[in-house]
Amino acid sequence: MGILGWVGLIAVGVLCVRGGLPSTEYVIRSRVAREVGDILKVPCVPLPSDDLDWRYETPSAINYALIDGIFLRYHCPGLDTVLWDRHAQKAYWVNPFLFVAGFLEDLSYPAFPANTQETETRLALYKEIRQALDSRKQAASHTPVKAGCVNFDYSRTRRCVGRQDLGPTNGTSGRTPVLPPDDEAGLQPKPLTTPPPIIATSDPTPRRDAATKSRRRRPHSRRL
């Protein structure tokens, strides 16, 4: 497949115009990736104009325990960030600014083991990623959204768009993306086969149902 084909699988989806209002979005799609080379072959996502909304078509919930690789493409103008699930053979392009911000917070978490080699490596990684993020300030928008607006996808225009599967927001329910028939982004994301891990919490209060069951197991005395 040529370079134009790869770009077509990842990048731009043009949405129809309703009611005279501009509704063009820059859709960044996930794709099939059976091996690392499938991700590295994909060209960088070019930065669109400032009047376009960015939307990352990722699953509504990602189980990070199933992620086999994280790619920060340093040479890309928008610091393309990709999560790879080798088992599902999927690569998800995610919001680099939100993901890297959380990643840097994890790297600076003080509760990590005070191992000298690990600490030096972690600090060096933090410095490199911090510099990569700071050098791309022109790609991010720092204009706050209006009160009561929650954007589920990154948008340089900071429009209150949200996800269509969570209900209409500001009249965007009529916008239908024009997707190629062979593009997997047009399909509904399948639920993960492995549920997310459940964190057990200690409960000092004894459970009444367990005590009731133990009492029921006691043998009853028979009267002669």
UniProtKB/Swiss-Prot annotation:
Basic residues bias: start-end ranges: 213-224
Domain gL alphaherpesvirus-type: 23-201
Coiled coil: none
Segments for region (Interaction with gH): 20-161
Signal sequence annotation: 1-19
Region annotation Disordered: where it falls in the sequence: 161-224
UniProt keyword terms in alphabetical order: Disulfide bond, Fusion of virus membrane with host cell membrane, Fusion of virus membrane with host membrane, Glycoprotein, Host cell membrane, Host Golgi apparatus, Host membrane, Membrane, Signal, Viral envelope protein, Viral penetration into host cytoplasm, Virion, Virus entry into host cell
Cellular localization per UniProt: Virion membrane; Host cell membrane; Host Golgi apparatus, Host trans-Golgi network
Function in brief: The heterodimer glycoprotein H-glycoprotein L is required for the fusion of viral and plasma membranes leading to virus entry into the host cell. Acts as a functional inhibitor of gH and maintains gH in an inhibited form. Upon binding to host integrins, gL dissociates from gH leading to activation of the viral fusion glycoproteins gB and gH.
Assigned protein family: Belongs to the herpesviridae glycoprotein L (gL) family. Alphaherpesvirinae gL subfamily.
Protein name: Envelope glycoprotein L
